[in-house]
Structure formats: C-alpha cells, structure tokens
Amino acid sequence: MPTINQLIRKPRKSQKEKTASPALQNCPQKRGICTRVMTVTPKKPNSALRKVARVRLSNGFEVTAYIPGIGHNLQEHSVVLIRGGRVKDLPGVRYHIIRGAKDTLGVNNRKQGRSKYGTKRPKA
C-alpha cells in the first residue's frame, strides 16, 4: 500500500481498455486485398468447413476475416471491405467481410436478412 506522498509523486496508472479489433484502428471498416482464400474447421463441438480469407489491409495489417453467407466469389487479389466482429467457433478470426461491397457479391436468392448479405430486393 503506497503512502499519500508516494501517490503524489507517481499517481496510479489507469488501465487501458483493450479493443476487440485492433487492426481497424478505431475505424468502422477498412479496405483490404485477399492474399489467400481458404476453409477452416471450427473448434469442438462444431463441425463444418468455414470460409475465411487472409486479408492485407490498407494500413499494412494482415488479418483473417470470415466470409458470411452461402457461396462467394472471392479469390486472391479481390478487394474487400472488412468490419469487426468475431466468429465464436473459429479461433483467431476477429473480422467479417462485408457482402455486397467492393469485389464481394451479395448472396444469391436471399429473401430475409438481405441487408446483412448485400442482396437487392427481389422484383415483385
């Protein structure tokens, strides 16, 4: 326990709050280029082949981002927009690719929750 004089000389440091998505650097989204598109398996007890991409961001960071929705058109050198948001069963995946922005197409035949998957409103 420090004395009052010690606290006057050297006050207590407040703890810095850690951000969940440091590569965004307090921006809502960042642009990046896919360096590798692959599938990874989730941790127990889930089982699947989740689609992810390794993305080199415009600020120099390289992150792994999840590709949401059924089917995608991404390949190496595709320009994508990423947002924060982790995938709970994929360790190390802390970002999502935004569907319908830049080179990423929206999800085909999507009727509900379209805004989250970059799908236009169906005709009639």
From Swiss-Prot:
GO cellular component: small ribosomal subunit
SUPFAM superfamilies found in the cross-reference section: Nucleic acid-binding proteins
Coiled-coil portions: none
Family note: Belongs to the universal ribosomal protein uS12 family.
InterPro entries linked: NA-bd_OB-fold, Ribosomal_uS12, Ribosomal_uS12_bac
Gene Ontology terms for molecular function: rRNA binding; structural constituent of ribosome; tRNA binding
Pfam families associated with the record: Ribosom_S12_S23
Gene Ontology BP, a term: translation
Region (Disordered): 1-25
Source organism of this protein record: Borrelia duttonii (strain Ly)
Keywords assigned: Methylation, Ribonucleoprotein, Ribosomal protein, RNA-binding, rRNA-binding, tRNA-binding
Function: With S4 and S5 plays an important role in translational accuracy. Interacts with and stabilizes bases of the 16S rRNA that are involved in tRNA selection in the A site and with the mRNA backbone. Located at the interface of the 30S and 50S subunits, it traverses the body of the 30S subunit contacting proteins on the other side and probably holding the rRNA structure together. The combined cluster of proteins S8, S12 and S17 appears to hold together the shoulder and platform of the 30S subunit.
Subunit structure: Part of the 30S ribosomal subunit. Contacts proteins S8 and S17. May interact with IF1 in the 30S initiation complex.
Protein name listed in UniProt: Small ribosomal subunit protein uS12
Gene name tied to this protein: rpsL
Modified-residue entries (3-methylthioaspartic acid), positions: 89
Superkingdom in the source lineage: Bacteria
